[in-house]
Amino acid sequence: MKKKNIYNWTMLLAMALLMMAAGTACDQNKNNKQASEPTVEQTEMTEVDMEALAKVMPKYSSASGFSEGLAAVCDKETELYGFIDKKGNEVIPCQYYYISTDFNEGIAVVYKSSEEWSLIDKKGQEIASFDNQFRPGFNDGFHDGMMAILNFDDDKEGYIDKTGNVVIPAELDMKMCNGPISTNFSDGLRRWYDYSSQKSIFIDKTGKKIFECEGEAEDFSEGLAAVRKCFTLDNDDFECRIGFVDKTGSEVIPFTFTHAGHFVDGLCWAETENTCGFINREGKFELTGDYKTLVLDEGIECGNYPLCPTFSEGLAWVCNKDGKFGYIDKTGKVVIPFRYESHYDEDSELFVTIPCYDFHGGLARICDKATEKYGFIDREGNEVFPCQFESAEDMSEGLAIVERDGQYGFIDAKGNCTFDMSK
């Protein structure tokens, strides 16, 4: 999928790879909010002024979606970054070299230059500043009060707290394949994979090891984590299966699945050789159909990425055996017909693009196979916005950032847009 956003990930990855060369799968925490920070509900109810946004957006060359009431923007003239609110006010001036993450838990990560980055609060006040001794992790900032930091000289990562103090030294091996380099704490635990022992290790926020298990684990969700184990067969070949462990590392769902996602509202996408659908916490299939797992062709040597659906706002997209996508509800009823198609490589049996996405704020993104442009549908499958945007993100706090003809703007669930839709 071709997608642009405000963050200069290409630049960041390039610097990462250069530094490394020089040196060598398929929750928001509400308890760590500072008392002065608005709740998620208060932030989402912030009044939006679409007319004001329409007036200011032409001055920016790119923008992100809103997070905690603010959106990152890049000034066309200076090519520097700052933040606007939902009324179009530039509350944090465009003065940064670039922005690494949106606001999360009241903090954003910004670069003052290519050699110096900082944590700032929502008033633009600097909390802590860092040089290139280590870099911010490739994730979306703070979770559970912690954020990953990367040391490319030693290929290690650690964690800082919201004051900028190093809580866990950068001594954990960075995970380079089959997932992001750095992961967030989830359910109070963080995972990392030891390639030498082929075991997954879970640590708490002090860096203490809680347990380890054989195989490559995913993050915990609703108290369970998927783990992928590979077994040697009689012919010296091997096969891999996925099961689930609890927070003690005990197996609670047997290793019988070829693909599996993570639990949301007590359901998890899973697939065996004969069955595909959603399982419950006992590992039993509750919703099944003539489905298959979406496996994306990532074009990387270390493998391809299975994208497992989850329920969001009561609906989940699924792919049928014919390669068409639609949406089902939690009874298994098809609510939006199987009419969305993806580019599919028959030789590799891999999908190249994603035609539809989860629902957020009452709308879901869709992507037209022919034009590779994005639009939005409502929960009945009606097109609120036809596929006309070169890039688009999910609805967030009542708005979604979209790109049309090289210009960024916002849309809402009522069909309003900061663009002149008559052109």
Give, region by region, the residue ranges found by the protein language model:
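Intrinsically disordered, low-complexity repeat and linker tracts
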Residues: 1-3, 26-49
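C-terminal motif of bacterial Sec signal peptides marking the signal peptidase cleavage site
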Residues: 21-25
